[in-house]
Curated annotation (Swiss-Prot):
A Pfam family of this chain: Ribosomal_L21p
Gene that specifies this protein: rplU
GO molecular function: rRNA binding; structural constituent of ribosome
Residues in coiled coil: none
Protein name per its UniProtKB record: Large ribosomal subunit protein bL21
Keyword RNA-binding: yes
Origin superkingdom: Bacteria
Keyword Amino-acid biosynthesis: no
Protein task: This protein binds to 23S rRNA in the presence of protein L20.
PANTHER family, per the entry: 50S RIBOSOMAL PROTEIN L21 (PTHR21349), LARGE RIBOSOMAL SUBUNIT PROTEIN BL21M (PTHR21349:SF0)
UniProt GO cellular component terms: cytoplasm; ribonucleoprotein complex; ribosome
Keywords assigned by UniProt, alphabetized: Ribonucleoprotein, Ribosomal protein, RNA-binding, rRNA-binding
UniProt-listed GO biological process terms: translation
Length: 102
């Protein structure tokens, strides 16, 4: 069984036991998170939400918080001696999906 959830402005396909990386949540490591915005549940009985599936939840355990690899943002204007170099590391939360309840 799998489900499509919405979190952090993104839609993510999840299955039980899967590790996922999502936008940072304000939750301590080791706690359990419940997602109520379940858009789709697939498997033997398919349920499509409009926009969400009523009564469906996905529970996951927070494994750790971290920051992604650094990306370099370099802005440049030709012939104007205008250069700006900036780095960015996006924070994330690593989850392990425990159960899909539909």
């Amino acid at each position: 069984m799998y489900a499509i959830i919405e979190t952090g402005g993104k839609q993510i396909k999840v299955e039980a036991g899967q590790e996922i990386y999502i936008e940072k949540l304000d939750v301590e490591a080791g706690e359990t998170v419940t997602f109520d915005k379940v858009l789709f549940v697939g498997g033997e009985n398919v349920k499509v939400g409009s926009p969400v599936v009523e009564g469906a939840t996905v529970t996951a355990k927070v494994e750790k918080h971290g920051r992604a690899k650094k990306i370099i943002v370099f802005k440049y204007k030709a012939k104007k001696n205008n250069r700006k170099k900036q780095g960015h590391r996006q924070p994330y939360t690593k989850l392990v999906v425990e159960a899909i309840n539909a």
